[in-house]
Amino acid sequence: MLHQMKLKSAPFHKIKSGSKTIELRLNDKKRQQVQVGDFIEFSMLNDTSQKLTVCVTALHHFDSFAELYAALPKEKIGYASNITPDPGHMDAYYPREKQEKHGVLGIEIRLTYLQKFVDAQEHGYSFGENYETALSEMKQRQKISHWIWYVFPQIQGLGISGATAYFSIKDLNEAKDYYAHPVLGARLIEITEELLKFQTDDPMTVFGYPDAYKVRSCMTLFKYAAPEQELFQKVLDKFCRGVEDDKTVDVLGV
């Protein structure tokens, strides 16, 4: 599941820099829906165009923020080692009555680098088009505009262009995150399914060079990131005679 939450500038930048890995919230009805493995998209209160995506790795339940502060490492909450947190600090934001009613929650998180893919698919990137354009072109059976980097991403190290490098997936774990992300994973499946509907089995006639090779790299990557999903191998079978991209396999070390 993907949750949307807002943050003030200071905690937003602490999470972005990696100096804060536990977000504190009242355990109200909305927060009770959060589960380990879910994703949270944080947007900054005073600039909602600034966003980042994290994955939930653990949930810490307490009766009050004072208990939470006493139990969890202050560095994970975002305090420097030479700072002593005030146990009553959160009372100004969440009165004691609400803490007693709902309980409180420490959401332990891991920063991902998926937000750039979400942003590019929503709004385009530089001269590249958005996901809806990409899907429309695949339904019309011909790639016309530019969007390949963030719709069919490759493993890091295969390309030297700015966009290729920027939108590269750094390793197998990040590919698994991408596939598990409720928006990115669903879109990857949706647009990949369109490829199987093509009458042609020649990727060059659809994507041209070098994008046809990028699609093969992408299919190879996600074949290993999501081995339970047969879709990616089916595309390799259709367009590449079942042959994986050797360079992707080498980088993955599989």
Located regions from the model:
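Conserved, aromatic- and glycine-enriched, well-ordered alpha/beta core segments
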Residues: Q35, T112-Y213
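Short, charged beta-turn/beta-strand-edge "cap" motif at the junction between a beta-strand
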Residues: M44-S49, V151
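Short beta-strand-centered aromatic/proline hotspots
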Residues: Q50-H61
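Short, solvent-exposed beta-strand-terminating loops
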Residues: L59-Y69
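A charged, amphipathic interaction segment
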Residues: I189-V254
